[in-house]
Amino acid sequence: GESRAEKFQRQHMDSGSSPSSSSTYCNQMMKLRNMTQGSCKSVNTFVHEPLVDVQNVCFQEKVTCKNGQTNCFKSNSRMHITECRLTNGSKYPNCAYGTSPKERHIIVACEGSPYVPVHFDDSVEDST
């Protein structure tokens, strides 16, 4: 099966491309990365930075996760990301997404050995 670290990479890493202003980016990527099977995932963020840079976030600023767990970390620098959001009225199997390129600090949950990202928690404008 797929490990949580592998799932994180499948759902959130797109190192090879820069943030796309193409309105079809999310429709293509959500399908390509198997997030429209059985249901449409409502919100998903892709990170356009080298994997090692995202893995390094696990050793940056420690923050509390949205669910109250304490294994989340915020990136020291802003990263290029694309936010995909299911459009209103979009119904499975016709999953349609809005595409928003952004530059933000990311917050990830990390676990395991090696200690790597396993969950994308949030993205924030500033470093506070």
Curated annotation (Swiss-Prot):
SMART domains: RNAse_Pc. Keywords: Disulfide bond, Endonuclease, Glycoprotein, Hydrolase, Lyase, Nuclease, Secreted. Residues 1-24 are annotated as: Disordered. Glycans are attached at residue 34. One of its GO terms (molecular function) is nucleic acid binding. GO terms for cellular component: extracellular region. Residues 1-13 have a biased composition (Basic and acidic residues). InterPro entries: RNaseA (IPR001427), RNaseA-like_dom_sf (IPR036816), RNaseA_AS (IPR023411), RNaseA_domain (IPR023412). Its EC number is 4.6.1.18. The keyword Transport does not apply. It holds the Pfam family RnaseA. Endonuclease that catalyzes the cleavage of RNA on the 3' side of pyrimidine nucleotides. Acts on single-stranded and double-stranded RNA. Belongs to the pancreatic ribonuclease family. Monomer. Interacts with and forms tight 1:1 complexes with RNH1. Dimerization of two such complexes may occur. Interaction with RNH1 inhibits this protein. This is Ribonuclease pancreatic.
